[in-house]
Amino acid sequence: SGSDRLPSEVINNSDFIKVRQQLRNDEWPTGCIDCQIQEEAGLSSYRTRSLSHSLISKPDYDSDIVHIKDLQLKMTRACNYNCRHCDSASNSGFEKYGRDFPDIETKLKNEFQFGHISKPKEKIMIPTSEVMNDLFENVIPDVEAIEFSGGEPFYTRDMYKTLQRMIDDPTVDTKKISLIYNTNMSMLEYKGYSVKPLWPHFKGVHVTVSLDGTGKLFNYFRTGGDYQN
């Protein structure tokens, strides 16, 4: 696991160099089992979808040393919705429900194997300040696309601050960077921060909106949301 190491220490370490060499030799690394199963069944995989990514230039597949072009950041586990398909690993609000109603949490987990409001075994990884500093120094200057998700990516000041930091950093050319969002699109500003003055500094913005039905179905499934708004 690279969880205790900085991104720049992991990207080109011996383990990842070996993975690239295996892929060049048409060998499946053990950590790629999900993509292997999907592709051998004739389905698209995360790997094949990434290869068709139109927002980044083609990598140099012959080199063992790479520069990251496509970066994914999850800046928060908080969300302003409590969607019924989600759980505490991706939404801290569900974990709070479990703490507030421990009897219900225990009953759901023990009798129904329903752990959506239990403390998650693994939470999504939120980058620390040390990780962000490393990314700005060693990764982001070469990046061509950054995807923000969460939680709800617009529901944290850290996302807006990260965009502003990129704009202010002389080593980062934001006009070469496309922004990608996976969002419920219920907000574009948060606690005095807004994307409106920030987005024009970037090459482009691509937004995927989670909807899941209309009208009353939307309001039921996406608890906390209002379809009319």
Language model segments and positions:
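Accessory C-terminal segments flanking Radical SAM cores
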Residues: 1-53
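Juxtamembrane luminal stem/stalk of type II transmembrane Golgi/ER carbohydrate-processing enzymes
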Residues: 29, 34, 49-66, 105-118
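C-type cytochrome heme c attachment motif
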Residues: 33-34, 81-85
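Detector for the c-type heme attachment site
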Residues: 36-38, 86-92
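Short cysteine/histidine-rich zinc-coordinating motifs and their immediately flanking basic loops
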Residues: 43-58, 91, 95-99
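A Trp-anchored, charged/polar loop motif used as the substrate-binding/catalytic surface
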Residues: 54-62, 125-137
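Core AdoMet radical
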Residues: 68-78, 89-127, 141-157, 169-191, ...
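Short, well-ordered amphipathic alpha-helices
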Residues: 132, 159-168, 192-196
